[in-house]
Amino acid sequence: DRKLLARYLGVDESLLGGPAAAPVAGDLISVPRLAVEASAGPGALASREETISRFGFDARWLRGVASAPQNVSAIAVRGESMLPTLSEGDEILVDRGDAADRLRDGIYVLRVEEALLVKRIALNPAGLGGRRLSIRSDNPAYPDWEECDPATVEIIGRVIWVGRRMA
């Protein structure tokens, strides 16, 4: 019996040729989509951070990838400095609970002066001048910022997911 086999294997019955299970709304966590864009380019000014819509994510999945679901919000990407990893119009989930105090190599949303950016951060070994970081663009047409003082950068949160429209 397909249903029994699916239960035994811990998979959805649809993977074994059966009908797709209807999604259960109680298993979703609502994540706010903010009226903010993170620039993958010269920098976007974040003037308002109001919720304009919401996305629903599987509760178990979100708890597994985020520091805590309430720390997560979605924002849009603007610009091309992070191509091919991030494209203009992509939606990214930002975990604000995974920021400066847990900093490690990865893609982060950060604020430099008034500009909100999405960039790759690489930690440099602590030398005589203390801990430094490099802020990098994945697109080689854009410059990297090497040996930055972490005190000059506000780390907003780590990017934990990207969604994009398939043209």
Tell what function each PLM region has.
Residues R111-L117, V153-E154:
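Short coil-to-beta-strand transition motifs
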Residues R7-G10, S14-E88, G97-D101, G127-L128, ...:
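Short, positionally conserved secondary-structure boundary motifs
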Residues A122-A167:
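Glycine- and charge-enriched low-complexity intrinsically disordered segments
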Residues V94-D95, L110:
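A generic structural signal for residues embedded in beta-strands
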Residues A100-L103, P143:
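Short, solvent-exposed loop/turn segments at secondary-structure junctions
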Residues D1-R7:
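Short, basic-rich loop-to-helix N-cap that marks the start of a DNA-contacting helix
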